[in-house]
Amino acid sequence: MLKEKGVTATFFLSGDAAEASPATAKAIVDAGCEIGSNSYSDDSLKGEDRETVRKQITKGTEAIKSATGVETMLLRAPYAAFDEQNWIDSMDLVSAVVSWNIDSGDWLLNGADEQMSTVLDSMTPGNIVLLTDSDECAEQTLEALPQIIDGLVADGYKIVTLSDLVKTDTALSKKLTSLTKVSMPKNAVFPQLPEDDDTTE
């Protein structure tokens, strides 16, 4: 559908979904869209230990690479739950953690028209829209998406991938050409969170 509309987007796949439907994952890349990881099993990473966090991220990216040939370090953490400790535990595995500022509300199952209105009424330049493809939401999202695209284009917006969106921000480094390929410097010093201190001042 996106290809027919002449637009591209960024898809965040869970590793288990890429394993279950490798042809679909490959078709996303072949259509010129960007791909990122939603970890492996779409379970929340917040509060998990270092080993679990790294395993979820690594298995997710490996499954995506196996299905698509694309190596990505771009993460949309499940439920947008990713805390400071998660960052410290995975800084060498993740280039950027992406959230959204417009939730289409597709998961509420209020209908395609309501979903479309939520997006169009909330839109301002640079916004990131969350659309999901779960079994419960997929049919409604597929119905709403052409209307959303047509509405945004009619309002003068251009729909782009996250990496292309970042390139429009002149405050960011010119070297940041793709969010999916940034890595930590080899000599990076990993921060340590302070130990809990019960003393008061």
Question: Residue ranges of each PLM-predicted region?
Answer:
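His/Asp/Glu-enriched short active-site or ligand-binding loop at hydrolase and phosphoryl-transfer sites
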Residues: 71, 81, 86-122, 157-168
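C-terminal domain-boundary segment and adjacent tail
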Residues: 3-9, 18-20, 137-201
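Structural recognition of the beta-strand scaffold that forms the well-ordered cores
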Residues: 9-13, 34-39, 73-76, 96-100, ...
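Short low-complexity, flexible loop/linker segments enriched in glycine and/or proline
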Residues: 25-28, 51-53, 113-115, 173-179
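Active-site beta->alpha N-cap acidic-glycine motif
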Residues: 1-48, 52-66
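Acidic-and-aromatic substrate-binding clefts and catalytic sites of carbohydrate-active enzymes
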Residues: 13-21, 43-51, 76-82, 105-110, ...
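Alpha-helical scaffolding segments of alpha/beta enzyme cores, especially the outer helices
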Residues: 23-30, 55, 59-62, 85-92, ...
